[in-house]
Amino acid sequence: MATEAAPPRIAVRLPSTSVRDAGANYRIARYVAVVAGLLGAVLAIATPLLPVNQTTAQLNWPQNGTFASVEAPLIGYVATDLNITVPCQAAAGLAGSQNTGKTVLLSTVPKQAPKAVDRGLLLQRANDDLVLVVRNVPLVTAPLSQVLGPTCQRLTFTAHADRVAAEFVGLVQGPNAEHPGAPLRGERSGYDFRPQIVGVFTDLAGPAPPGLSFSASVDTRYSSSPTPLKMAAMILGVALTGAALVALHILDTADGMRHRRFLPARWWSTGGLDTLVIAVLVWWHFVGANTSDDGYILTMARVSEHAGYMANYYRWFGTPEAPFGWYYDLLALWAHVSTASIWMRLPTLAMALTCWWVISREVIPRLGHAVKTSRAAAWTAAGMFLAVWLPLDNGLRPEPIIALGILLTWCSVERAVATSRLLPVAIACIIGALTLFSGPTGIASIGALLVAIGPLRTILHRRSRRFGVLPLVAPILAAATVTAIPIFRDQTFAGEIQANLLKRAVGPSLKWFDEHIRYERLFMASPDGSIARRFAVLALVLALAVSVAMSLRKGRIPGTAAGPSRRIIGITIISFLAMMFTPTKWTHHFGVFAGLAGSLGALAAVAVTGAAMRSRRNRTVFAAVVVFVLALSFASVNGWWYVSNFGVPWSNSFPKWRWSLTTALLELTVLVLLLAAWFHFVANGDGRRTARPTRFRARLAGIVQSPLAIATWLLVLFEVVSLTQAMISQYPAWSVGRSNLQALAGKTCGLAEDVLVELDPNAGMLAPVTAPLADALGAGLSEAFTPNGIPADVTADPVMERPGDRSFLNDDGLITGSEPGTEGGTTAAPGINGSRARLPYNLDPARTPVLGSWRAGVQVPAMLRSGWYRLPTNEQRDRAPLLVVTAAGRFDSREVRLQWATDEQAAAGHHGGSMEFADVGAAPAWRNLRAPLSAIPSTATQVRLVADDQDLAPQHWIALTPPRIPRVRTLQNVVGAADPVFLDWLVGLAFPCQRPFGHQYGVDETPKWRILPDRFGAEANSPVMDHNGGGPLGITELLMRATTVASYLKDDWFRDWGALQRLTPYYPDAQPADLNLGTVTRSGLWSPAPLRRG
């Protein structure tokens, strides 16, 4: 190796060649780079394999030596091992006439649960036999008389992933059995028959007999922490990687080049465009729509601290989010301050501002002089960036950090190419790896590294002549692998592999060739394919297409830097291809392109300027394509997810203002194409002028030549105005914008302060004026309305059924998400007017008459006119502004009316006016019809119901209960912040003050309430959380009975905001089980048993 300085002319011609002594001065740096880099990489790679301290948990029963039921819902559904021993004499409590109601000696699920036999273990009396049933399989059966006989010693049961076995020790098979005289035992294998455990339940009471034992090893493989060895290795790995990067930097300085400043000049200054972008982002932070998964992620983050790891709370049996959980861990730390939406999304706002700063300060200057000096390019970049960011990245999902990570990775690579140094490459590897493991869509970040392989290989080749390959590659290898340390800091390699195999097996896990599903959703009239989302993607594709076309035609876009421009285009293409390999296909994944969209927008703006695209015809055709993209985008709804949709104009219809916007835009497209044809056939010059244009003409030309900038900013304006208008039109009712602005004043509980709950609907019943309570409902006229004129099953019709829903069916093949307690049924005892209909919302049949028009067989016309009911005074009406009637059936709103009258009018048999009810619920289930008391004149003192059912179709019928004025309290006051709550994943961000039920050591906390979104959202998200997917619904439906509580949204009475359910345990006296905890060291390859998959 040369020891003398290279000639100055060589330094000027080839800056990456040596200009300094590379011998003694850099020998230490070379050794450090090799040793520290290789050791750092080895330690990082070894991190997943190093041992951890696992907290073990054992569920033992009986507890306190008595027959007492305990709750222990396992988040993984099953124990790794289960051993049960039951003395035969313990079954004596099930025998005899005095124990007729006692049937279960021991079970892992409450016997009352609908799927108890299918999923759990029950040792129960069936007729005169004692039967052990495991997942709907009678494993072993013995006559109760033999069990209580002298020869029977005990029943033993063991369950492992590969087999389950049970035996009545002391008893033998009868003469008619397959093996007469053999021990009475049963066994099943070939399938995972381990029963689901939500506790240990029994119908017996009193002291437990000696020898009774239930021992379950809870699956706590993810409740682990690093051992001192692993902690030391991680610290050393990070330190060695840092040392290797320092050594690489020293080797980089051997080129003798002056250090370039890290930040561009005047990076801190702001212009008018910067101010506008900042203003839009900040305002959108308050009024803008959020993403559908914000509640999902927020709940995971909130629960993780107590749980000890970042579990996928809503699916996949509580397995961890790793390797994609590090970003969520940061959100968990952030949530320590507040869980309010404006606070939790503050990092997202910071990422948005950083993205724009990088685009405007780093990306645009690197793309060439034409891009740097073009105002059209800057405005198009800003418009494209906002058009993608606003609808796709204003939440807690990882797309914002991935979008930023892609930009920063590209900037690091470009710095490496520009300076011929390798430290920026190592930094790019770290940023790229962190971006990759921010979420599944982080796979898009690999493009930033792949597109620069050519120039980076050249740099490496030049420098390897002086330092060798290993001193240069080892630090980069350490940088590329160091992210394994935070990802596997407290988890093992085997555990993560099993978790990811489970997720793939349970699904959803779509293949690369299913990518068309993402685009099908993009073109559906739903929030997934809304105007904003559709335009964002189509505009990005258009910008990519024109940039590629111009680059292919002319080698590069005139006036741009060829290398950076090609790499930006390459990154985008590779990102689209990489997205094919994500396991789910949702349109919110396009949020990762926000930064690239701004960069491509700048390129596309220059590509269609007069200097680059001289043909007026071609520029006009491009403008026509932009208008067509607008037309195609407006052929959808202006829809947003859940509460973000409240009050938004055209949220359920195509935008229309006197005429259809999509049709008008399509007609405009045709006109612009005709103009292009005119340029082609008539005025086919290149459009160049020799005269100096006026200032007005120059500005007009700039606008005309920037159709993409105009379109993007029009869409940004449309989105901002839509959500601002929603907040204004909703006021004083709840909206996202109002809630976020109120949070600045300390009101941070969101929707919980505006949802009004009616705990006791019986208290608000209006009193009949003359007729007895039992007869008042039909006192005026009752033709074919009878107390039992209601079908036994009034389950609500599904509101949605989309392609792919079959992946999320419950065991009955039905889409879950209905409101329990509203599906009807019958009762054993008749109500006050002889009806046996089961009433919803805790209505008392002893005080609530009901009449319906349905009958078995041929239907007949039916009419109902109730007696008069007394209205409260005007002062009382002001405190309770709503009148409600609980109804069921399928009918039009005009068929059920409320009439009012004064005392004099009522006495004369006349009414003073009438109105229709607002029907918010889902037919034909029970729901609350609503009427605002403000619509009733203050002089009215009485009301009555009038119903007319002239439709003879069997599915068309009406059932009514008496009117009432609800006595309500806020959900925040009823549920509070202390009770454990099952927050559906769509509602988590809207209810930040409610405490989601936790889990620790593999056992879930038992929730007392469940909060659901609107019915559309409930049907969409409930299947994700069900038993098939390993979610909490598979636990709560076995442990508790859900009952819907009547609720209303303040000042927005006719809104389906969602539902509140009270969860009542099947065994109210059951207490949380005490677990026996321990600690054991496990290697990174240890596995206790396969994870349950169904």
Curated annotation (Swiss-Prot):
Induction of its expression: Positively regulated by the transcriptional regulatory protein EmbR.
Top class in the EC scheme: transferase
The EC number(s) this enzyme carries: 2.4.2.-
Stored Pfam families: Arabino_trans_C, Arabino_trans_N, Arabinose_trans
Keywords: Antibiotic resistance, Cell membrane, Cell wall biogenesis/degradation, Glycosyltransferase, Membrane, Transferase, Transmembrane, Transmembrane helix
GO biological process: Actinobacterium-type cell wall biogenesis; cell wall organization; glycolipid biosynthetic process; response to antibiotic
GO molecular function annotation: arabinosyltransferase activity
Region (Disordered): 817-836
Residues annotated as transmembrane: 28-50, 232-251, 264-286, 341-360, 373-392, 431-453, 466-488, 530-552, 565-582, 586-608, 620-642, 657-679, 700-722
Protein role: Arabinosyl transferase responsible for the polymerization of arabinose into the arabinan of arabinogalactan.
Protein family membership: Belongs to the emb family.
Comment field (misc): This is one of the targets of the anti-tuberculosis drug ethambutol [(S,S')-2,2'-(ethylenediimino)di-1-butanol; EMB]. EMB is a first-line drug used to treat tuberculosis. EMB inhibits the transfer of arabinogalactan into the cell wall.
Protein name: Probable arabinosyltransferase C
